[in-house]
Amino acid sequence: MEKKESLDSSLKEIVSVCKRRGFVYPGSEIYGGLSNTFDYGPYGVELLQNLKQLWWKYFVHLREDIVGLDSSILLNPKVWEASGHVSNFNDPLIDCKNCKTRIRADKFLEDQKGEGFATGLTLEKMNQVIKESNFACPNCGQRGTFTEARDFNLMFKTSHGASAEDSLDIYLRPETAQGIFLNFKNVVSTTRRKIPFGIAQIGKSFRNEIMARQFVFRTREFEQMEMEFFCEPGTQKEWFSHWVNYCMNWLTEQVGIKKENLRVREHEKEELSFYSEGTSDIEFKYNFGWGELWGIASRTDYDLNQHQKFSGEDLKYQDQVQNKKYVPFVVEPALGVNRLFLAVVTDAYEEEKLPDGETRTVLRFSPKIAPVKAAIFPLMKKDGLPEKSREIFADLSKLGNIEYDDGGAIGKRYRRQDEIGTPFCITVDYDTLKDDTVTVRERDSMSQERIAVNQLKNWLFERL
């Protein structure tokens, strides 16, 4: 119990700093909110954009074998029949008859019995365990009040069309991948790509989660960075290994996440998705325990074969070198943007005890992803210091998001930027007017040094 309370407390600290410093706000807050919806504030959206741009750089621009795509959220409903999502994209659901609370049965059993307990359990077995154990409802505390477990489809349904007579029942996409498969033939034709190659995209997906929880970790509306890598059948294991290593390296070397907070977990056969022959998750050690950050799945030729069958289109690839046609196999690294956001904030968060006995909260982001690259502080709002500060601000803004802050004591301004994760604070003082130098204070060590204004831009560029 103490461990759980400690985990809950540390997650609350993350939520608190995110709200206090404008990273994440509750959705629809002035109307009382809407459960499990969040808005990303000024610093949150900067962090998200930096993460997405860094991913696009290393998964598209720096690779000759990957191109980008932005496919529609709304697709012909037959797509989801073909992909298997209509019949297979389900979670087990139970209800409390007393308080009407809906609960995801497998996660509830694992909360009661331990992590991994529900892996591979059928609905019948879940019902048996729940009945025999006589668990209490976590909401009202009543025992013996659960309904039988049943499948609950996670796709959001909506209508397409202006009138009831002409409207078509469609779904908000639960993953971005299918839009890539639908455009495989188009991309091959227009870009003349040769296998092996990948198609990457960033976009919103929607899943009507039974138990959406843990801040932005599991939400009904979320963003994905997915890439489908098409390869010749028989080579998929080699590419699978390549992408697991490539993704892990990107997280540690580019994003700057500590290695001890990451691990690779291979899925058991019983927990594989219906389309996968093998999946490995890169997991992050969140405040609530280890959780999936990045799933790398070997989807075989399942999706392209299904779309061939349902659409009647030939989606085989013509290999001109080997003079043969085949349906490519696919390796998919799928990364949740919101989960990555929570991971980097959690990894960077620290409450540091200072020599004077005070505690400072600091987000130790890598400068590559920090929402603010540097902050400019005029020591006073007079004597030409604001004018000089504005000159420096205008010049440095070409390097990225630079913040100008002239409110309050310097010490309080430092603390505010520490909580935002700003790596460098630049103070313009009276010595600046004499010798054209500024004081640069580094976030992590809090060390300070004087830098000439005419060298400041290059100095900062080398560290970003």
UniProtKB/Swiss-Prot annotation:
ATP binds at residues 207-209, 217-222, 292-293, 336-339. The gene is glyQS. This is Glycine--tRNA ligase. GO terms for cellular component: cytoplasm. It holds the Pfam family tRNA-synt_2b. Substrate binds at residues 104, 175, 222-226, 332-336. PROSITE patterns: AA_TRNA_LIGASE_II (PS50862). Catalyzes the attachment of glycine to tRNA(Gly). It comes from Leptospira interrogans serogroup Icterohaemorrhagiae serovar Lai (strain 56601). The keyword Aminoacyl-tRNA synthetase applies. Homodimer. It is found in: Cytoplasm. The lineage of its organism: Bacteria, Pseudomonadati, Spirochaetota, Spirochaetia, Leptospirales. Belongs to the class-II aminoacyl-tRNA synthetase family. It comes from the Bacteria. InterPro entries: aa-tRNA-synt_IIb (IPR002314), aa-tRNA-synth_II (IPR006195), aa-tRNA-synth_II/BPL/LPL (IPR045864), Anticodon-bd (IPR004154), Anticodon-bd_dom_sf (IPR036621), Gly-tRNA_synthase/POLG2 (IPR027031), Gly_tRNA_ligase_bac (IPR022961), GlyRS-like_core (IPR033731). It catalyses: tRNA(Gly) + glycine + ATP = glycyl-tRNA(Gly) + AMP + diphosphate. Its EC number is 6.1.1.14. GO terms for molecular function: ATP binding; glycine-tRNA ligase activity; protein dimerization activity. Keywords: Aminoacyl-tRNA synthetase, ATP-binding, Cytoplasm, Ligase, Nucleotide-binding, Protein biosynthesis. One of its GO terms (biological process) is glycyl-tRNA aminoacylation.
